[in-house]
Regions:
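Short low-complexity, flexible loop/linker segments enriched in glycine and/or proline
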Residues: 339-343, 365, 387-389, 563-565
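Cysteine-centered catalytic environments shared across enzyme families
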Residues: 1-345, 357, 361, 542, ...
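Adenosyl-5′-phosphate
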Residues: 1-4, 78, 121, 174, ...
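Generic hydrophobic alpha-helical membrane-span motif
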Residues: 35, 153-156, 282-285, 380, ...
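A generic secondary-structure signal for well-formed alpha-helical elements
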Residues: 25, 176, 263, 291, ...
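Short hydrophobic/aromatic residue motifs in ordered secondary structure
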Residues: 32, 153, 280, 377, ...
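Active-site adenylate/phosphate-handling loop in enzymes that bind or generate adenylated species
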Residues: 148, 359-418, 468, 485, ...
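Short, basic, helix/turn surface patches
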Residues: 133, 348-360, 399-406, 580-582
Length: 634
């Protein structure tokens, strides 16, 4: 696990400037650093830099940038690479590349050898989490590559025929000549969904490379494509269905065991996050089965009972016989992390579960350098409550159309009768846009986000959703979450929270073979109308008694309404003061000031009320924190 950055430019970016960009990511790689500049063609210079967190082959042989040896009829030093992540099948690939003169036991060198032999299509053979920058001197091309599901981040800035890239926004912001011009349309969408999805970023001309994406840069020309696309892979795998549940369970179990085993290969201490839920408990159980010693497990508990799951995690740990560590966190302990959010989430990010994720990462880092997580189980095996609601909404869609039609009749239109309907009925009656139906969000949220940022041109449609060509709302939303929410929110949250403490998080459920196999399963194996994550739960019950796992999920939550109207109130009032907003020149000062004042007086309606406005206010607050850290101080 590391951080990478670099450039391809005709400008005069010095080696000192490149090192400064690299050092903004010290937390991502405290063990080693490297920075080099190469002379390219047509007046271009190529700069590569990396911060290293040593996981495999802790020797100096793993230093980056790394260069190719003479092999396959190609001269040495013709290919250079910087790389963030892990290639879990590097051992298998190394055997296929046995005629390459390897000098290390690093997966980075396997990437170089694979590229020399197979070209850029070598990425199709790689199973892992990665962000790669590769420079081929023969063709004077630079390639940027991101893993299939977006576990590792990769930003890039294109301007004036030049390219600058980095694992985070910080190295781009540190690059000479960078302009911090905020995109208003992206800001409005952030307020609505609480994260910023690829390919967008908060800044103009800066983008995230999409999951499963490749960018080729050659003397100012850019070409992008996807080597792994959710929709295409889903339909391809659907052509090879597995019809028998027991057969599917056995094959999936085998794939999960192999995925966990490959993620336990490390030259540093390794453990597992454990919440006591299905996914983390199953990953921990398989890891324990695969380990000669008790696996180190970590969980945090909260003093407020409605948020606390530590007792469940402890029960599972005792049953499995792990080496368990837990820590109880009071509200003060969580609140103290709020100020550090913009430093490590260097783009506006408002999923408040980032705070407990940082806390459990800090706890784990005291004893290990690598931690397994259960991320991906909800998206690939139908675990979210939202999916239940979508199944209900699709059944009610005809009734929703009828209600919508009735409320539009002369004499009723404009009477605001929708506001008297239950929020679930409003969601299906008001939202008639076929490209927005799976979002199940009250239109009031959308209107509020648009009102916060005037003339933002906010459009909350996802262009890829119609391309799935799937009629079932539940399946379509699962695919959309894999494409957007999983990489943009969940994996971003885990990456930044773990990297804050130089901890590597690994997600076995997001193994390439597991993801692709999940697409071969009939949807009834995941959701049968009553039970979600059906097949994954069945595997978990092979390891852990059902009564330990079957309970309502609490999740990593924090008391936002209490914080915003309590200890954060003074800062929130400052950020929403009409004069301040007028000087800032981003938001509608009158509207936002009135909205926040009303919120502070009346509070939050709560989930399912249609007026759960603490989410938007928290997103506004975190943006202002970020703005103070990166824009106002500049």
């Amino acid at each position: 696990m590391c951080g990478i950055c670099g450039f391809v430019s005709r400008g005069d970016i010095s080696l000192e400037a490149l090192r400064g960009m690299n050092d903004t990511m010290y937390h991502r790689g405290p063990n080693d650093s490297g920075a080099e500049i190469y002379v390219g063609g047509d007046g271009y210079r190529v700069g590569f830099a990396q911060r290293r967190l040593s996981i495999m082959d802790l020797s100096e042989l793993g230093h980056q940038p790394m260069h190719s040896e003479a092999a396959f009829g190609v001269a040495g030093q013709c290919v250079s690479v910087v790389f963030n992540g892990e290639i879990y099948n590097f051992g298998e690939l190394k055997k296929e590349l046995s005629d390459y003169p390897f000098k290390s036991n690093c997966d980075t060198e396997v990437i170089i050898a694979a590229y020399l032999k197979w070209g850029i299509s070598c990425i199709d053979r790689m199973n892992g989490m990665f962000a790669i920058a590769l420079y081929d001197r023969r063709s004077d091309e630079v390639f940027l590559v991101r893993d299939r599901i977006g576990k590792k981040p990769l930003y890039y800035w294109i301007e004036g025929g030049n390219l600058v890239f980095g694992s985070e926004l910080k190295p781009l912001m540190a690059c000479p000549g960078f302009r911090k011009e905020i995109r208003r349309d992206v800001l409005a969408r952030f307020l609505y969904q609480q994260y910023i999805n690829a390919p967008d970023s908060i800044f103009k001309d800066v983008y995230k490379l999409e999951p499963g994406g490749v960018l080729r840069f050659h003397q100012g020309e850019v070409k992008k494509w996807k080597y792994w696309d959710i929709g295409r892979v889903y339909h391809r795998m659907q052509e090879r269905p597995v019809e028998d549940f027991d057969e599917a369970k056995g094959e999936l179990k085998g794939l999960l065991k192999r995925a966990v085993a490959s993620r336990m290969i490390a030259d540093v201490p390794l453990g597992s996050f454990l919440s006591g839920g299905y996914d983390s408990s199953l990953m921990t159980a398989i890891a324990q089965e695969n380990s000669a010693e008790p696996v180190k497990t970590f969980s945090i508990g909260f003093e407020e009972e409605r948020y606390d799951e530590a007792a469940y995690a402890r029960q599972v740990a005792e049953y499995l016989g792990t080496d368990h560590t837990e820590a109880y966190i009071d509200e003060k302990g969580m609140f103290e992390l709020v100020e550090s959010i913009p430093k490590y989430y260097d783009e506006p990010f408002a999923d408040s579960s980032q705070i407990p994720t940082m806390l459990v990462s800090a706890l784990a880092r005291e004893r290990v350098t690598v931690a397994l997580s259960g991320d991906g189980g909800d998206e690939f095996f139908c675990g979210y409550q939202m999916y239940d609601r979508l199944a209900q909404a699709q059944r009610l869609d005809g009734a929703g159309a009828f209600v919508h039609g009735v409320l539009g009749l002369p004499g009723l239109k404009g009477a605001k009768l929708e506001e008297r309907l239950p929020v679930k009925v409003r969601a299906v009656s008001e939202n008639r846009d076929p490209e927005l139906k799976t979002q199940m969000c009250p239109p009031a949220y959308l209107k509020t986000a648009m009102a916060f940022v005037p003339e933002s041109g906010l459009d909350c449609r996802y262009p890829q959703e119609s391309g799935y060509q799937v009629k079932d709302w539940q399946i379509r939303r699962m695919l959309l979450d894999m494409d957007t929410y999983l990489p943009g929110d969940i994996l971003c949250k885990v990456d930044r929270a773990s990297m804050k403490y130089s901890l590597e998080a690994r997600c076995p459920i997001l193994d390439k073979d597991v993801m692709e196999y999940s697409f071969r399963l009939p949807h009834s194996f995941k959701y049968d109308g009553k039970e979600k994550k059906r097949i994954l739960k069945s595997i978990a019950y092979d390891y852990i008694p059902r009564e330990m796992l079957d309970r309502k999920k609490k999740g990593f939550s924090v008391p936002l309404d209490k914080w915003l109207r309590g200890p954060l109130r003074e800062s929130l009032e400052t950020y929403s003061e009409k004069g301040f907003l007028g000087r800032q020149g981003i938001f509608d000062a009158d509207y936002v000031s009135r909205f926040v004042t009303r919120y502070l007086e009346q509070g939050d309606g709560g989930p399912g009320s249609g007026s759960n406005y603490s989410r938007i206010v928290w997103a506004f607050y975190t943006f202002q924190q970020w703005y103070a850290c990166y824009i106002r101080q500049a």
